[in-house]
Regions:
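Short Gly/Ser/Thr- and Asp/Glu-enriched loop/turn motifs at secondary-structure junctions
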Residues: 121-122, 218, 265-269, 507, ...
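Active-site palm subdomain of RNA-directed nucleic acid polymerases
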Residues: 208-218, 678-701
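Short beta-strand-to-loop capping motifs
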Residues: 703-707
């Protein structure tokens, strides 16, 4: 039941995310922002709220059973709202982090508001995501078909007052205020817009299932993590940006010379130019360009233009601008994690997307004398002058980052290219290391070892896999052994003799374990097979061998037919069978390996509900069954579909759309959700033990602790051991699972373990 709560909504003004250009006499977006992007969306709410120009235009709020009230600067304080908070009452907002930031950094110091207790806040946006609805209020209102909706004209009114304007000859003002003469009607429209947002937020909240106590507990911890933020190396970011700007200018000049004046960013014109040179592309996004560059017999000039587009359009190096623009005054990035951003409950990232950072830089060698990295084409180490040693192993290591940043500090593109070759690749390799511990602090990080593989093995009861994890065997090697028939002892002997893994580990075991666990076929294998040495028939053989070795996992995916379509029989089993039964028979629960499937009429509407071992629920709205149209469908086979919000054009139409699913994908959702529940439990345990999390990335947790000298003589760091022990402590529903954290490290800069 929804507890009584107040609802509030701020509308604000600020020049944050704008910069004045004297040459054009206009406001522009910050450096590196996408064309046309300015303001709050570029700098993020934490930096926005702290900007000296940020102020309140209006606050609308409603206490339970009361009409909507308004407060604006210059009016008497909203003491009834203060009294509600003082009595322990809860206040809800849509994206409550923004309201909390404005309250804390504008209203408390400037207007004497009391502190806002975080534990008394609720967020209807987070609740929407937990319920698998879209987060944006306008979209949420449309999906829920609310009788009161977000005012479509409000954006015009907000833009009139909330951001600076470009002066004209007839009107030299750079700001328009609601209190300016002649603004009465539009000002009232803005205040009414804020009132309506409060009403829409309340209506949406009434239609959604509230967060469970368990969900709310972790949401509050996520709020803590976002409020705390993570430190960044701001000077090094600016050094990298200086080199990046030079590289972009250089590549831009080359592109103009090759194309007759076109910039790499002019997508439509560049597509036309490429078409004229025999290269037809519907998109110039990174995936499309990468695919095109694999083609043979391409016009050399067109290939070079595509290479330039790939370099300049790299999303990884553009993270630098986001880090610079979103940094707070204490050189920390905040509010980077979106709670329950994915259907499974896993987070998604904001701004520089810390959940998706590049892992590697250029392939360098380390000087045996001074230990510093350089291009393997040099005859001598450019750092110390010692002659190069043939046969040194090429690659990228986290230890290289400080040395690369040392050269970046010269801000010389030529010098960076001399030492490391591709400057943009060198920058990309450093981005992870630009996230740092704060002054006087260290980072400690560790990640789970193959946690999804452990989860699916335990769910399915695949005993040889469970035994392998309990014996701490390498699952990639164990899987390769099952597929190829080569004994595990042979692989281990190879490793002892050669000092490196057998090639089958990467060529066979890795793509099998990463690509096949959720029903993947040839394309799924190839995503993870960097060697690309097998034909489709060979890959198909590997997949069949993997499946033959993992019958319990295949059973877990489930299906609707036993045997071949021409001589089998209908039977619903596993996750797919349970989902179909639940949809077909509302009100009944169907259990598979402790996972419950049922169809119920939830506050937001009819939905398929999957209840995990933890008790957390996954929601699939308006789930339906239809006759399957896939090739080789078994007699009477049904397909499952549900309604969801799609914001990625790669997956089809945008908006509230119907998507299909099947046993393998349901297994993927369930396994990822359970793995995330384990990570949540660990974060709560670390918090209780005094290890505050600054970042969590799927299977990894990063905490920040006071610095201390390195342990002497290779003695293990007790704090790393403690972090990993807490991470390996399982909740009651996963007792005895062979989950372990490994590869822990301690240091000043973030790196891949």
């Amino acid at each position: 039941m929804r507890q009584p709560r107040a609802t509030m909504d701020f509308e604000t003004k600020s020049a944050a995310g704008f910069r004045w250009c004297n040459a054009t006499n206009k406001w522009r977006g910050p450096k590196g922002a996408a064309a046309g992007r300015k303001g709050l969306g570029v700098v993020g709410a934490p930096a926005y709220a702290r900007h000296p120009s940020t102020d309140v235009l209006t606050l609308s709020y409603r206490l339970p059973g009361q009409p909507v009230r308004r407060w604006r600067p210059g009016m008497a304080p909203p003491r009834d709202l203060f009294a509600w908070l003082g009595a322990g009452g809860h206040v809800e907002a849509h994206n409550v982090m923004f309201e909390r930031l404005i309250w804390t950094f504008v209203c408390v110091p400037r207007y004497g508001f009391p502190e806002l207790p975080p534990a008394q806040l609720d967020c209807s946006m987070a609740t929407a995501r937990v319920n698998s609805f879209p987060g944006a209020l306008g979209n949420l209102g449309d999906v829920l078909r609310l009788s009161v909706r977000k005012n479509a004209d409000g954006r015009r009114l907000l833009n009139r007052y909330s951001i600076p304007r470009n002066p004209t000859k007839g009107d030299p003002r750079t700001w328009i205020a609601p209190t300016d003469p002649g603004e009465e009607a539009d000002a009232e429209g803005l205040y009414a817009y804020c009132d309506q947002d409060v009403a829409t937020e309340e209506a949406a909240s009434e239609r959604m299932a509230p967060m469970t106590a368990m969900e709310r507990e972790f949401w509050l911890v996520d709020q803590e993590i976002n409020w705390r933020g993570i430190a960044i190396n701001r000077p090094a970011i600016r050094d990298c940006i200086a080199v990046l700007d030079q590289a972009i200018a250089q590549y831009g000049a080359e592109c103009r010379a090759l194309t007759g004046g076109l910039e790499p960013s002019q997508v439509q014109k560049l597509q036309g130019w490429l078409s004229a040179h025999g290269v037809y592309l519907h998109s110039l996004d990174s995936d499309a360009v990468a695919e095109a560059l694999t083609r043979k017999n391409m016009d050399p000039t067109a290939r070079r233009v595509l290479e330039i587009r790939a370099l300049v359009g790299s999303a990884s190096v553009k993270k630098l601008y986001a880090m610079e623009n979103m940094a707070c005054g204490d050189d920390r990035l905040r509010d980077l994690i979106v709670h329950h951003g994915a259907r499974t409950g896993r987070p998604t990232g904001e701004g520089p997307q810390p959940l998706n950072l590049p892992k590697a830089g250029p392939k360098l060698v380390a000087c045996p004398s001074c230990g510093r990295p350089y291009l393997p084409t040099h005859d001598a180490c450019p750092w110390c002058g010692v002659a190069a040693v043939p046969g040194l192993k090429k690659g990228w290591k986290a230890e290289y980052v400080p040395h690369v940043l040392e050269i970046m500090a010269t801000r010389s593109l030529a010098l960076v290219e001399f030492f490391f070759g591709d400057a943009l690749l060198a920058i990309s390799g450093c981005i992870r290391g630009l996230f740092t511990a704060g002054p006087g602090m260290d980072l400690i990080a560790s990640d789970y070892s193959a946690i999804e593989a452990v989860v699916i093995a335990m769910l399915a009861g695949e005993q040889w896999r469970i035994d392998a994890f309990r014996a701490r065997k390498d699952i990639y090697l164990a899987s390769a052994s099952k597929i190829t028939g080569t004994t595990l002892e042979t692989y281990l002997a190879y490793e002892r003799d050669h000092g490196e893994h057998h090639p089958d580990r990467q060529k066979v075991g890795k793509p099998a374990e990463l690509g096949l666990g959720f029903g993947g076929w040839i394309n799924a294998w190839r995503v993870f097979d960097e060697s690309d040495t097998f034909t489709d028939e060979e890959v198909k053989g590997h997949i069949k061998a993997w499946r033959a070795a993992s019958p319990a996992i295949i059973e877990l995916w489930g299906g609707q037919w036993r045997g071949a379509p021409w001589n089998g029989h209908a039977e619903r089993y596993g996750f797919e069978g349970a989902a179909i039964n639940a949809i077909q028979y509302p009100g009944q629960a169907f259990m598979v390996r402790g996972i419950k499937f049922e169809r119920e009429v939830a506050p937001g509407g009819d939905a398929l509900i999957i209840t995990l071992l933890s008790g957390r629920r996954l929601t699939y709205h308006d789930a339906r069954l239809e006759p399957s149209t896939r090739d080789y469908a078994a007699p009477g086979e049904l397909s499952i579909s549900y309604m969801t919000w799609n914001s990625n054009p790669k997956y089809g139409a945008l908006g509230w759309v119907r998507m299909s699913t099947f046993g393998g994908r349901l297994t993927e959702n369930i396994v990822q959700a359970i793995a995330h529940d384990i990570l949540r439990f660990a974060i709560l345990g670390l918090r209780a033990a005094g290890f505050p999390t600054v970042l969590h990335v799927y299977d990894e947790i990063v905490v920040e602790v006071p610095e201390r000298p390195a342990m002497a003589g290779g003695v293990p760091d007790p704090q790393i051991a403690m972090v990993e022990a807490i991470m390996a402590t399982m909740p009651a529903w996963a007792q005895g699972w062979p989950v372990r954290a490994a590869g822990g490290w301690r240091g000043k800069i973030y790196r891949k373990g």
